[in-house]
């Protein structure tokens, strides 16, 4: 049972990544799998549909890794640009982000370093930066780079196969250059490995580990999610099970329905199907806040045959 002060701070989070101290965060099997894999240096990727909790998983995993002295950087690939940018600009932008996030600016003159590498391609510069700068100046026992919204590379005017080949090369170098044992990557996005690779002869993902991010199950969601329901309904576990039956455990919709119970339920034994019909299905376009169903519709409309 929650104390009054707990309830005062409790809220369901609909959309966006959950802060590390969110009481409504649901720990799933994927949390432990990803943490364990990254701790031992495995290359991981979390590919799933939108609003499945990838960003929240990344935030929580980063917090736990950093508590274990792992140096972490999260780069939102959408910030690096889309169709308008050149390959040179894109890779340089990635280096700038890594310099910024790892706070290297005070010990590293990026402009001078670049002037020394003008004869190298952008991907060669990134490779050199990783080995000669990142792995030297970041002294933590391990380094983990998260690349979020990685599916955005599909909108670029050039192939990023070289990026994934470089990630694979970092792993293959471990056998003869132990410094690379300190470095690992985690890719997150709405994609499949084959979506991201233009040249199908390249297979960078066969060295990686896929983390399966599935919907909430009652056993794992019961403790965090019933806490907000206890003051509003008589049987919070029963109500939560009804919510999960409707949402299939999809995180966004589950949080949204829990919040609707708190805000809209007319009795302590709410009819979840009625709430779904009234506040999600009927006039859905005007009630789709924050946008979720519209995003699904737009992606379906825009995804013609490849």
Each model region followed by its residue ranges:
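Winged-helix-like regulatory helical subdomains adjacent to P-loop NTPase cores
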Residues: 3, 219-222, 226-306
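Mid-core helix/loop region of P-loop NTP-binding domains shared across ATPases and GTPases
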Residues: 97, 101-147, 151-161, 166-168, ...
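Short regulatory helix/loop adjacent to the ATP-binding pocket of P-loop NTPases
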Residues: 177, 191-208
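Conserved catalytic segments around the Walker B and adjacent sensor/switch elements
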Residues: 63-83, 144
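Conserved AAA+ ATPase "SRH/arginine-finger" region at the nucleotide-binding site
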Residues: 208-219
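Conserved NTP-binding/hydrolysis module of P-loop NTPases
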Residues: 72, 84-108
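Walker A/P-loop-proximal flanking segment of P-loop NTPase domains
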Residues: 2-65, 132-136, 228
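A short beta-strand-to-loop transition that corresponds to the Sensor-1 phosphate-sensing loop
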Residues: 149, 182-193, 257-260
């Amino acid at each position: 049972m929650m104390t009054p002060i707990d309830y005062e701070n409790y809220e369901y989070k609909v959309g966006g990544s959950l802060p590390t101290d969110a009481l409504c965060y649901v720990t799933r099997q994927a949390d432990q799998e990803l943490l364990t894999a990254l701790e031992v240096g495995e290359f991981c990727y979390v590919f799933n549909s939108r609003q499945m909790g990838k960003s929240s998983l990344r935030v929580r995993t980063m917090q736990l890794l950093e508590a274990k002295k792992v140096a972490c950087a999260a780069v939102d690939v959408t910030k690096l640009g889309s169709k308008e940018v050149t390959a040179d600009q894109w890779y340089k932008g990635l280096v700038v982000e890594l310099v910024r996030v790892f706070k290297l600016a005070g010990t590293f003159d990026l402009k001078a370093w670049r002037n020394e590498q003008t004869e190298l391609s952008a991907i060669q510069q990134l490779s050199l930066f990783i080995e000669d700068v990142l792995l030297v100046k970041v002294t933590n026992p391990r380094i983990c780079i998260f690349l979020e919204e990685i599916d955005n590379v599909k909108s670029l005017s050039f192939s990023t196969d070289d990026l994934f080949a470089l990630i694979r090369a970092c792993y293959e170098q471990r056998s003869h250059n132990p410094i690379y044992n300190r470095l690992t990557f985690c890719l997150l996005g709405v994609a499949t490995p084959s979506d991201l690779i233009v040249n199908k002869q390249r297979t960078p993902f066969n060295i990686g580990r896929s983390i399966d991010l599935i919907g909430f199950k009652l056993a794992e969601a019961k403790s965090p999610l019933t806490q907000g329901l206890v003051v509003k309904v008589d049987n919070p576990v029963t109500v939560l099970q009804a919510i999960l039956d409707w949402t299939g455990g999809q995180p966004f919709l589950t949080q949204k329905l829990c919040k609707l119970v708190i805000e809209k339920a007319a009795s302590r034994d709410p009819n979840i199907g009625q709430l779904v019909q009234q506040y999600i299905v009927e006039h859905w376009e005007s009630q789709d806040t924050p946008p979720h169903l519209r995003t699904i519709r737009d992606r379906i409309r825009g995804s013609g045959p490849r």
